[in-house]
Amino acid sequence: MCSTKVPNERTEKMNSGLISTRHQVDPKKELSRILRTDAAVKGIERKANSEKYLTLWPKAVLEALDEAIKENRWQSALKIFNLLRKQHWYEPRCKTYTKLFKVLGNCKQPDQASLLFEVMLSEGLKPTIDVYTSLISVYGKSELLDKAFSTLEYMKSVSDCKPDVFTFTVLISCCCKLGRFDLVKSIVLEMSYLGVGCSTVTYNTIIDGYGKAGMFEEMESVLADMIEDGDSLPDVCTLNSIIGSYGNGRNMRKMESWYSRFQLMGVQPDITTFNILILSFGKAGMYKKMCSVMDFMEKRFFSLTTVTYNIVIETFGKAGRIEKMDDVFRKMKYQGVKPNSITYCSLVNAYSKAGLVVKIDSVLRQIVNSDVVLDTPFFNCIINAYGQAGDLATMKELYIQMEERKCKPDKITFATMIKTYTAHGIFDAVQELEKQMISSGENLDIL
């Protein structure tokens, strides 16, 4: 930690604790859940580096693996998988490999995926369509489209592993995210040649890709093809992609027009639709329309969710309309909708921008009395707020509590604190943070 002494500007607050670090146990949690998390899962991870444990309880190992995959901890997942392979009861399964490829794709680890594929073959398993599709996804998400396409070509040569509509859709999704719409067109042509029709998900993927790229003519052209197809009709996801695209492009007229046209097609909106409308009107500064959507939702018995309230709170906060933001936050709590870390981030950012440090203090007090799960972005937000306010003591205390809350500081955390300490001429604190930054694996070049 930084050894530098800083002015203790909020002694009372520091003594009482900024954020309660007591472990708050929910009495409704099942004992089995606690045991699984605290004993089985963590225990398996500790044993993953050892050669001794060859007769572990199957349920514990498999749940530990699922937990690591779910949380995208690819290194832990591979260690646990290696431990799994050593168990006397282990049987190789394609489904397990497919799950591992998924996490490796999410974490952009193509080399690890290639090695894992070799391990799979060495165990005598015959890859399935799902395995190849997952491998294509890994390469695509890692921006290795050549490898993704070569895997697709290999699939075509395997008699019982011909690529299906899901395989093509996964590849299309990767190309859309990389802006390779030339390849998207060639994939669709190839699908037609092979007699593989586009599904609703395929069309939606292309529509969403064009929309996010601001290619509205192409987006509407694909929608026309979808309607003409007749077998894969537009659904609420299509609606959300279309209006979301025009909303992001600040084309409110088109957004509202397509909303009405989809209703005439019999496609009914869902909560995501309304959230998109609220967000779009908010970004455009059309606050009356934003509020009218919320009123419409309540009249139609759509429950306003945490996401809905977060959008409105952030919108009013960014606009500097603090009173309106506070009104919405009060309504949120009155309606029994639970705030999350994103809610509190928006509040802190707005108060910080308005110079209302006292209000930020009140946010901290509310968090102490709640069971909200805090994350690194929240700590970055509130550390920045107190840093800008010149309250270095509180900033430092919050940094300490990050570790107590198991929130790992990232490059934003370090950059924010280093900038603040530099501005105040506290250079020994800067040096200490730079050391911690290096030891944590962060790059000093970002500073």
Swiss-Prot record:
PANTHER family reported in the protein's UniProt record: EXPRESSED PROTEIN (PTHR47874), PENTATRICOPEPTIDE REPEAT-CONTAINING PROTEIN (PTHR47874:SF6)
GO molecular function: mRNA binding
Keyword Repeat annotated: yes
Cystine residue pairs: none
Record family assignment: Belongs to the PPR family. P subfamily.
PPR repeat segments: 93-127, 128-158, 164-198, 199-233, 235-269, 270-304, 305-339, 340-374, 375-409, 410-444
InterPro entries: Pentatricopeptide_rpt (IPR002885), PPR5-like (IPR044179), TPR-like_helical_dom_sf (IPR011990)
Keywords: Repeat
Superkingdom classification of source: Eukaryota
The UniProt record lists the keyword Iron: no
Protein name as annotated: Pentatricopeptide repeat-containing protein At3g53170
Pfam families given in the database record: PPR, PPR_2
PROSITE patterns: PPR
